[in-house]
């Protein structure tokens, strides 16, 4: 009874495509990350300096233009995406094109953008995994066969090649076609609505439309029906410039094989077929035979080039429409592997396996090749008329940006205007721009960042500051980004220059993971601090391949970088004040306008608060006397500035006080009811130049406006505003005209002030100031929290409603993109985010709607008295916290609401205790930082940590090493990380081999490459390498572990040692050998300039063994280790002379991939890559390894670990099919044969290739169990709970959590309800996605935590209905969801 929850989505990009998706004129990028589908728009921004020396004759300044990616929508699909295609359909809802998504097991989903829902809408889904298609006994399983999606450039049909020989053809209706929907053969055709229609697109109002769906009936054919010679297809793609759908295909009549090259040389053929969809026939146009056997891809080329480019491992071949070929060999093996006629360019020495091809523009024959190591090459096709007369290749130099990509790209998408996107699973995905040096003297008309995003007050002109705050732009490389000529950089005028515009971070592939301790708190007064601001542990994973290798440091909560801190008693609030000069109107736009005052509110007695004012200067903060500042010791509600920063307004409980820039009293405005003369109190306040909104305790409103002199005057409120009661309200400056359309270029910003109010009956009103007579919009039933908030009336019969406490509309984003969001806070501190949008239904008066943002934030319940905060206003917006526009929620669940240009809004917790107040803080020592007060009365001045990303609910930092990191281990005693890295080196056959004397005469310059390992020490204080140990030729690190070992047989001294297992592999026909290293990390005198270099590696023991050392672990309590060497598992101990003495062993079968011990028990598991998992035990008297049980399924083990659950012992196993299996050792079960057989309880398909499994430290399943102040006699025993952390090659992180019987029943029933009651993106079934076909064990399956968390996305009424069907209440389900999504409090 377990639950799998994905904590971090995959980040490696697998597929990408560009198309006009949101509208007919838009340019969108669609990105697939295994199971995540993201929609991006593009925006051009310009950076530069306004210094006069860079100005031209007219005083204009040329600024560097960048294209940035802006995330529009993101969807988690219940399937693994295998292909994307663009289809132009008739009468799309957006006016743009539709997207065709292929997923694993032969499924096609056709989706389009729906402006009514502000999201994707599934037109249809088509299934082709029918049994009759795969009835042949020798046909491989469908899940083992890759699928290929190809779409006709004219959108007449799409082909899905699946199951090796099967193709599904899906026609699409186009203007003028003669397809008939009503005529189809039921024995051969699919139904006209497809296998499913979710929902079918409604019939359009145009009477001339003759089709109900944009597609016709699809059908499945074997490839041999098109041509009997298509026995072994390799690759196919549709071609351009044909009247009918025409595709080119690579195939062979025999299976290609490098080992049989002498007999199967040049057996590949290329053919072009034209499809007649109506007759289901094909016509062969051309056939080119005797092609090289290493061809693997067809790349269609648009006009004017036309034809197709065939890519092989050693050559490139162009085939035009008439079958004429031109070829070039790019390494010396091209001549040896093929007799095909080609131009010799073997001096390039390129390896084309896994390369990506993209055409540079449509008016030339230049093609960009990105190789597997990230290097770039330009392929030039010499065009003579409409035919290609020659082909040549040239590498791109580093000066021209040829080394921008560090590893192999997985896909590419041309975005037009000199922009190409390269997605990668091995490094960051890049948006790259290209140009020629001859164009550098041109000055293109670009938009500045100010023109794109509106008012200049939130942007900076200083170039250094811009790049410091722009967390998502690539740092400027003066070599490749400066405007150069051939005289300055040595480039020819026809060469291409590449530069990076934007990037999508990738945390994969995660090959290893460890838990380490942060280097320590940055708090200067750490001894005075009574609360933690740094994590106990941090998660460190390896990421990247090749030159892109490095580490990623992950934390679940935000650890602020503390500049300074101090202890103050009875502090309730903190506010920073930034004032402006009275004679200047542009002062506030300067980035150097620091805060002048810092105000603290201190409780003196009930109902009384003292305002303590500090003066902020370059030397720090000093307390100052301000006798006129709140002399009556009234409670402060909020503090802000008006009149261009010349008036400081302090809103107190009983009055509003206005001060000048020196905090001298200028005005007092009382808070009282003019009609009854009753004294009222202020509940909350909101500022927006020149207004201040006040909500009083009788739920009435007071709106004040500052005149030109700064004096406050009351704005007359009539009608709705005066006759109703209001729960909450705020003011919002609509800079970007999201709510109110633009009225003119000269419209002042004061005309864009919105008054947002939440009525007592939870009706939302939005007014556009100064108009207060009629609301801009009103939304009923906000407390129902539906997916879409609109002006339509809610359902009449509603039983359940949410208790809302606060509403706020604020901008969220970074320096690239900022968008307004409405944030609702409930009485339980739940945060619900809505994004405003216009559905484009009426152009005269656009309707305003709000769509709910998906974020599964669950606040923690803190029963302690410190968690109680007296202030009623918990949400506060900030315009610039280290470059972010963000919202902070104070209270017992302190958190930021963050958003970047490439991510959706999400909640990020602030580590530590409850926070009573937080304010922005901008001084020279803490630029664009923040100051906050926690429940322990500790005041901290902080900044967000540098070089850190906040794109998701985890705080992420990447450390670039430059080599591929295969293993990582934390050495706790020395507080340092040990890395097992590798880099490629040329391999040459040994000349002294006596068995193969012919190797001595081998003459070759294009060497094969092998991995050579290196062991490095990395300091977490500076994240730099402090020591390294180079391994031998062809020797690489296979495993690494920190083990507490006995280093002396006499004294029995125990010490932590670093144990490394290696393998020396020189070829498949040479037996591999291995070595076991035992290192001691010693302390040495550091380099004076680098104090972190005080650690060195010292070899304590080394032993060469037969067979590779593939896994190692500690075992028992005597300081021994167990290692897998070849086909044996052996227990060894250290001797006095530094040798390793074997004491016990066990014979294995093939290749031991996993070897782990349940710490301190002697129980261990041994995972064979081909023969399943073994469960054994180690005894010390006598030394012996005993096999207890093993599985009978022969699982292909990739990763495994223990999962204790009370008195039960489970073993989790991840196989090569992205599936997690749950095994149990239960000798009392009759079906286990007295324990000899591990019981297979359940299976769960994750969709990701699991790389590691890690048993996390135990934690209490109940918060009260960890409270040391509780009396042990009064608290029931709460068992410790374990979790297993799962990482993947795609960069995702998940956790497997054991469940109690009651929780499992509730969540299992809830999962069944959600599968049938929710609409799923692309129409994919979550239950079918997670199920395993061979899962016939009858056990209880693993529940899907991500599907269960979608229950939180529902409206309140819908959640209650689903909970009622399950037989539970809302609170019990929330507790269960907190269990499956939490537990990692130490990170």
Swiss-Prot record:
Ranges of biased composition (kind: Acidic residues): 458-471
Primary location recorded for the protein, binned into one broad class: nucleus
InterPro entries to which the protein is assigned, alphabetical: Beta-prop_RSE1/DDB1/CPSF1_1st (IPR018846), Cleavage/polyA-sp_fac_asu_C (IPR004871), RSE1/DDB1/CFT1/CPSF1 (IPR050358), WD40/YVTN_repeat-like_dom_sf (IPR015943)
GO cellular component, one term: nucleus
Disulfide-bond pairs as recorded: none
Pfam families assigned to the protein according to its UniProt record, in alphabetical order: Beta-prop_RSE1_1st, Beta-prop_RSE1_2nd, CPSF_A
Localization in the cell: Nucleus
Biased composition (Polar residues): 474-491
Molecular function terms, GO-annotated: RNA binding
Signal sequence annotation: none
Keywords: mRNA processing, Nucleus, RNA-binding
Superkingdom of the organism of origin: Eukaryota
Compositional bias of kind Basic and acidic residues: 444-457
Stretches the record annotates as Disordered: 440-493, 509-534
Keyword Oxidoreductase recorded: no
A biological process from GO: mRNA processing
Protein family (similarity comment): Belongs to the CFT1 family.
Purpose: RNA-binding component of the cleavage and polyadenylation factor (CPF) complex, which plays a key role in polyadenylation-dependent pre-mRNA 3'-end formation and cooperates with cleavage factors including the CFIA complex and NAB4/CFIB. Involved in poly(A) site recognition. May be involved in coupling transcription termination and mRNA 3'-end formation.
Name this polypeptide is given: Protein CFT1
Source organism of the structure: Coccidioides immitis (strain RS) (Valley fever fungus)
